[in-house]
């Protein structure tokens, strides 16, 4: 018999709770997990996205040169995007990694072309190039409402 160390812990991510993805959004990456394997875990915790202000604080921590003006617009964009996603109007999620990339892009260019142009280019490069075509009109509408 192998006895585990008293402080031994294991954690695993199962983005779909092991049930796979019925939406088709993650068809290549999220598969149905073995029920036998899933039964070995006795605690499941659903972790939602962090609140938009927290996420933007994370972006500001990692991209300290990002202007307040750009950060405020990114916060408004993220808040509205996540609401659209939660309400089912948008099917493509936006992650903290996306926002960090957007913040880095905007910060790199806003000193040369201004924050408004940097945001427009950043949104086009980081967000619009990666969303589902069906989401584009809704996401573009959000961007149009919050950007100068």
Regions found by a protein language model. Give the residues of each.
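C-terminal regulatory/interaction module of P-loop NTP-utilizing enzymes
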Residues: 1-148
């Amino acid at each position: 018999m192998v006895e585990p160390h008293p402080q031994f812990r294991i954690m695993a991510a199962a983005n779909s709770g092991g049930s796979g993805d019925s939406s088709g959004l993650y068809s290549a990456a999220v598969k149905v997990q073995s029920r036998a394997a899933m039964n070995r875990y006795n605690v499941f915790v659903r972790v939602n996205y962090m609140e938009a202000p927290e996420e933007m604080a994370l972006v500001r921590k990692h991209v300290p040169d990002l202007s307040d003006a750009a950060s405020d617009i990114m916060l408004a964009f993220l808040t509205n995007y996540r609401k659209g996603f939660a309400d089912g109007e948008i099917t493509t999620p936006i992650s903290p990694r996306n926002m960090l990339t957007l913040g880095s892009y905007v910060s790199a260019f806003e000193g040369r072309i201004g924050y408004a142009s940097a945001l427009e280019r950043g949104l086009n490069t980081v967000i619009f190039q990666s969303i589902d075509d069906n989401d584009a009109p809704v996401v573009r509408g959000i961007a149009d409402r919050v950007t100068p």
